[in-house]
Structures are given as structure tokens and as C-alpha cells.
């Protein structure tokens, strides 16, 4: 049996797969999204939350390009909080507690309603090949789907093994079988692969928790949503609870460390440093006598509670003992035990910045298969792969994500240049240009790019145009004004009486000056809405820093323009250490800027590469 032909086939309908398929379809591609079950599209396999520090920036950027995660999270959000609110706007991150069922249903609706996107139920066991090129997929029932490109978003399913204590069994996640035939097929491509692990905590019955003695955590009164299209929260808002481990909890865990899958030697994969298991916390932070736990309800009509902070691979009986030693959980019932899951991943240095494999034309990888952890990182990669697979088919240039224009660009560059030694997670600290890569201006940075690509719909175009007009009007009023220090002082604003005239934007850049303070000086600003006021304030706050940062951005762009040929032989370059030759060969940097970020790179080594490139240019032009 043969299915209809498609332009792009996406394998897997998790966060990466859904975003990849939707992006490809928005680009006009006939797209097939293959999932074991349509009901599994959009399942939140781990924590019931979207966003956070760095992660919230990724969701905003996905939304700016008309991706779906932000809209779906807003529809399913049952508690919204802006993290790092006390710090500067550049490092604040929106986060939402989500109703698992609402999220899954909203994502399925997005997939079903997208023109050009077809959902196919089945298991992919092999690739269709035309020579050395991937040209579609083969399903378990023997049927085939032909395509010009395939995007693999297998999550934790490639040779996945679930560990609970000393009991191990195959599984892609609890209740689902792993993908072994596809993993074996990837072996045939001789890709650099390894094993990683992640974990999840036991799920608790909220009806058996004593909420009355726990600290209550409410959401923000004025919730900050993800999508630039959303007007307000859709679902009823709820509170979460906070409790802590204690000395008794730690003693139970310490006594049973040898029974943990991780410490008992059953797991070879490396886990995420920034989301450690409770066993890891007890060992690595032995001086701490308590760890915070957030009790997060999984839905409005669901009694299940996710105890964020105690993921584990201890045996079930130990899980019951240590959980019931925690305040408020003395009588709790465990609905599903926590577990660790180990799975295959591909060294992302084998990928191009488009997330394609140079040695396997037609194949793109996105999500946890590339060594990342987290829904948001997966979704962002899915969109990158979907857009780039489409532009390649259309004969267009690759999508120019870079460290200067997006957190997406930072992540892709980190992965493809530096690789991973542990599951990669996004943080604001990874972005050197984070002052200009704020969550609030993601649309200003990326929606024009989306309009140029053709992946942005009419509604977003119109919303963006209205916002841009409001910002331009307010900015023009500020820029065109001019005030003496005395005039500024009469408005109650304290600045140096140095005799220098300043425009409104320069005044707004002073500490503690707010947009409202300038209304007496520029009455036309009185009609400016709250969102525009806040955005202009942030632009002014960082204006001087960003101006200085632009010099670094320009230097990076010059280095990015110095392209390194894909067949450049680093091993033949005298003067480089063998270690650096190996790292450069693995990373295959596409330009001098990327080469400079390879671990162990020195100015002298970079000069050698530049000299060889220039000799090659002269030889070609001779």
C-alpha cells in the first residue's frame, strides 16, 4: 500500500513534531504528520508547564513566527507567572501552569485545522531511499509515504528504556513502546550517537494532600501571556502549593541510594544538570537540609498533582516512604511512580544550522534527539527544521536565525557548534546579546522575517502592524521633542542641571523615570496604551547598552560572512592541535564566527584557519 505523496513527512507528534509540521504547512508544503496515535498529539510527557527563564523567550519567538505553542499554552494555562519580575525586563520569563487535557486538545485542534497538514496514524520503521537521499518513510504495515524531506522528532523513543529501581523495561514514555527499528536504521547512517537520560517524579492524588497546612502559590493578578494574539487567560485560574523535603526525607533517600537506577549502575546516559533527580540533589548538595517542592495540579478536572522537584528512579516502595515523609503529603497516594528514561540521541555537531544532516540529504532532526531537554527547546527546533526543509524544497536561502536576532539562533548555534555533554536547556545567560533579545520584542525581531518567508498569517500581520504603528507614534513624539534641564525639572523629573537639551527618549533612559512622567511635557503621549508605554520604557532603558552592543553584533556578522567550505579539511591544517582538529571536524563550523566558538579555539588557531581560507580564495580567483 502506498499513501499519497507529500512534500514533507514529520515523524512524531510531540512538541517538536507538531511545530515542525505546522511550520512546513504554513510555508505551503503538503505535510504529513505521522504519530502512533492521533490522541497522543500534544501530550505533555513530563511537567504540566510551559515557559520559564529563557524558555519563555523561545515560546515568544515561536509565536512571533506564527507557531502554535504560545497560543496553545494560553488556551490551556491555569496559572500564569512572570519569573524574575524583580530583575530587569531582559531576563524576565513568562511561565504557565497548563491543564494537560486542554493543552493536548488545543494542539490537536491546531493540527487538524491547518490547511495542507495531514495526520497519519502509524509507526515509522524505515526510510524510503533514493540513492543516498531520504525520500520518504516506510510504516510498520509495509505502506510507504514518499516525500522530498523527512523531519525526525523521536523524543525519548529511540531505544528508550524506563528505569524504576532495579527494574528496567523498554518504553518511549510510561505506557508507550520505544522505537527500535528506526534506531537501528539510524545506525546504518553511521551518525555519532550516544545515550542521555531524563526523569519524572511520582504523580500524586491531590485528594490525599493536606493543602491546609501548605504554603499557597497564586498566579499573577495581571497575567502575562505567551501569544501576541492573546487578549487574556481562557481557562479558570488556580493556585499551586509549596512544601519542602526534610532531614527524614534525605535520610530515607541516602539509605536507599544503591537501589536507585542511577546510583545502582543501571543507567549509562547522562542526565540534565539543571533538572536533577532528588537522589542527585541529596548527593550533590549534601549540606542542604531541605529542598523546595512545587505541587502543581495537572488539570481543572483532574485530581493528579505533579510534585515538581522530586524526580526519581528509586523503587516504588522507597518513593512511597520518602514522599510520605514530606509535610502535607503524610497520607498521599501515588497514582504513578516516578521513573528515569534513557534514550538515544545524535551528536548535534553532525547537523547544519538548518538541522539537516549533510551526510544524509533530505533528513532533518529536531527535539530531544539532538540532545536537548524541555518542551520549548524541542518546539523551537521543530519550527527551525520545518521552515528550513520548506525553504530548501522551494529553492530559497536558509532561514537566518543567529545569536544576534533570537534565542532560537543561540540554541541552534550552541548545539551545532559546541555539541552537548548533557541534556541542553535554554537560559538567558547563554545569550550574549540578551539585552536586545527580550521576550516583549520577539515580534519586532522575528515577525518581519516571518512575513518575508511567508509563514505568518493575516491575523498576525495585522496585529503586528497595529503594534508597530503605536510604537512608532510614541517613539516619534519622544524623539522629536527637546527640553532644557529646567523644563524637565518642572515636570518633577530630577536630572543634572548641565545645560544640555534632551529629547524625551533620552530623559526616559534615566533611572527611575517612567513614561507617565513625560506626559506633562508631551501631552500627546496621554493616549498611549499601557503595553506601548511599557515597551517604550524598556527600549529607552537599554538604548545606550544596545548601542554599544551593536559593535559586537557587527563584528560577529563580519565573521559570519567568512564562510568555511563544507569540505574544508581541518586535519590537514598544520599548527592545530590534534584535539582541536578533532573538535572542528566534529562541529564542521559553517563560518569563522562559529569556528571561534568551538571549545578550545585560540586566536592563533583562528588566524591559521583564516589564512588557509584566504589562500583558497586567491587560488580560486587566479
From Swiss-Prot:
Positions contributing to NAD(+) binding: 271-285
Xref: Gene3D superfamilies: FAD/NAD(P)-binding domain, GidA associated domain, C-terminal subdomain, tRNA uridine 5-carboxymethylaminomethyl modification enzyme MnmG/GidA
Subcellular location per the Swiss-Prot or TrEMBL entry: Cytoplasm
One GO CC term, this protein: cytosol
Residues annotated for FAD binding in this entry: 12-17, 124, 179, 368
Any Pfam family the entry gives: SAM_GIDA_C
Superkingdom of source: Bacteria
Subunit structure: Homodimer. Heterotetramer of two MnmE and two MnmG subunits.
Task performed by this protein: NAD-binding protein involved in the addition of a carboxymethylaminomethyl (cmnm) group at the wobble position (U34) of certain tRNAs, forming tRNA-cmnm(5)s(2)U34.
Family statement: Belongs to the MnmG family.
Name the UniProt record assigns to this protein: tRNA uridine 5-carboxymethylaminomethyl modification enzyme MnmG
Native species: Ruegeria pomeroyi (strain ATCC 700808 / DSM 15171 / DSS-3)
Record gene name: mnmG
Amino acid at each position: 500500500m502506498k499513501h499519497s505523496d507529500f512534500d514533507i513527512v514529520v515523524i512524531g507528534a510531540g512538541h517538536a513534531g507538531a511545530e515542525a509540521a505546522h511550520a512546513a504547512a504554513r510555508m505551503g508544503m503538503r505535510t504529513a504528520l505521522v504519530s502512533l496515535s492521533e490522541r497522543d498529539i500534544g501530550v505533555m510527557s513530563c511537567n504540566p508547564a510551559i515557559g520559564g527563564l529563557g524558555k519563555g523567550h523561545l515560546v515568544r519567538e515561536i509565536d512571533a513566527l506564527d507557531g502554535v505553542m504560545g497560543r496553545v499554552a494560553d488556551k490551556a494555562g491555569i496559572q500564569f507567572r512572570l519569573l524574575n519580575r524583580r530583575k530587569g525586563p531582559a531576563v524576565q520569563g513568562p511561565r504557565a501552569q497548563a491543564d494537560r487535557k486542554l493543552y493536548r486538545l488545543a494542539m490537536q485542534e491546531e493540527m487538524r485545522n491547518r490547511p495542507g497538514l495531514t495526520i497519519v496514524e502509524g509507526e515509522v520503521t524505515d526510510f524510503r531511499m533514493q540513492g543516498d537521499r531520504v525520500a520518504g518513510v516506510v510504516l510498520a504495515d509495509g505502506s510507504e509515504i514518499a516525500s522530498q524531506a523527512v523531519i525526525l522528532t523521536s523524543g525519548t523513543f529511540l531505544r528508550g528504556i524506563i528505569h524504576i529501581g532495579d527494574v528496567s523495561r523498554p518504553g518511549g514514555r510510561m505506557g508507550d513502546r520505544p522505537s527500535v527499528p528506526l534506531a537501528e536504521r539510524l545506525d546504518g547512517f553511521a551518525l555519532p550517537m550516544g545515550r542521555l537520560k531524563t526523569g519524572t517524579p511520582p504523580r500524586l492524588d491531590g485528594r490525599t494532600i493536606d493543602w491546609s497546612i501548605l504554603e499557597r502559590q497564586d498566579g499573577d493578578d495581571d497575567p502575562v501571556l505567551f501569544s501576541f494574539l492573546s487578549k487574556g487567560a481562557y481557562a479558570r485560574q488556580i493556585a499551586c502549593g509549596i512544601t519542602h523535603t526534610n532531614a527524614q526525607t534525605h535520610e530515607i533517600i541516602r539509605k536507599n541510594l544503591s537501589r536507585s537506577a542511577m546510583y545502582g549502575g543501571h543507567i549509562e546516559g547522562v542526565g540534565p544538570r539543571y533538572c536533577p533527580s532528588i537522589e542527585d540533589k541529596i548527593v550533590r548538595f549534601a549540606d542542604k537540609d531541605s529542598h523546595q517542592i512545587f505541587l502543581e495540579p495537572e488539570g481543572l478536572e483532574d485530581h493528579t498533582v505533579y510534585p515538581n522537584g522530586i524526580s526519581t528512579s528509586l523503587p516504588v516502595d522507597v518513593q512511597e516512604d520518602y514522599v510520605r515523609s514530606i509535610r502535607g503529603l503524610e497520607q498521599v497516594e501515588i497514582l504513578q511512580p516516578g521513573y528515569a528514561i534513557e534514550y538515544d540521541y545524535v551528536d548535534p555537531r553532525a547537523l547544519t544550522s538548518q538541522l539537516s544532516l549533510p551526510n544524509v540529504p533530505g533528513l532533518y532532526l529536531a527535539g530531544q534527539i539532538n540532545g536537548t531537554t524541555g518542551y520549548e527547546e524541542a518546539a523551537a527546533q521543530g519550527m527551525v527544521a520545518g521552515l528550513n526543509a520548506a525553504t530548501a524544497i522551494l529553492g530559497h536561502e536558509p532561514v537566518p536565525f543567529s545569536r544576534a536576532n533570537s534565542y532560537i539562533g543561540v540554541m541552534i548555534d550552541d548545539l551545532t557548534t559546541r555539541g552537548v555533554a548533557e541534556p541542553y536547556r535554554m537560559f538567558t545567560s547563554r545569550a550574549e546579546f540578551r539585552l536586545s533579545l527580550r521576550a516583549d520584542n520577539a515580534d519586532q525581531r522575528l515577525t518581519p522575517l516571518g512575513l518575508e518567508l511567508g509563514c505568518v498569517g493575516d491575523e498576525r500581520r495585522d496585529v503586528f502592524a497595529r503594534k508597530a504603528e503605536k510604537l512608532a507614534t510614541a517613539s516619534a513624539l519622544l524623539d522629536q521633542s527637546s527640553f532644557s534641564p529646567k523644563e524637565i525639572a518642572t515636570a518633577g523629573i530630577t536630572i543634572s542641571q548641565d545645560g544640555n537639551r534632551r529629547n524625551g527618549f533620552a530623559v526616559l533612559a534615566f533611572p527611575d523615570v517612567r513614561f507617565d512622567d513625560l506626559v506633562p511635557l508631551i501631552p500627546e503621549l496621554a493616549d498611549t496604551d499601557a503595553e506601548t508605554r511599557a515597551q517604550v520604557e524598556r527600549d529607552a532603558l537599554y538604548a545606550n547598552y544596545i548601542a554599544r552592543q551593536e559593535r559586537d553584533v557587527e563584528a560577529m556578522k563580519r565573521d559570519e560572512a567568512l564562510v568555511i567550505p563544507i569540505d574544508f579539511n581541518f586535519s590537514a591544517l598544520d599548527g592545530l592541535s590534534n584535539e582541536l582538529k578533532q573538535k572542528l571536524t566534529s562541529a564542521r563550523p559553517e563560518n569563522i564566527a562559529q569556528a571561534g566558538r568551538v571549545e578550545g579555539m585560540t586566536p592563533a588557531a583562528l588566524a591559521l584557519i583564516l589564512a588557509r581560507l584566504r589562500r583558497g580564495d586567491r587560488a580560486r580567483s587566479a
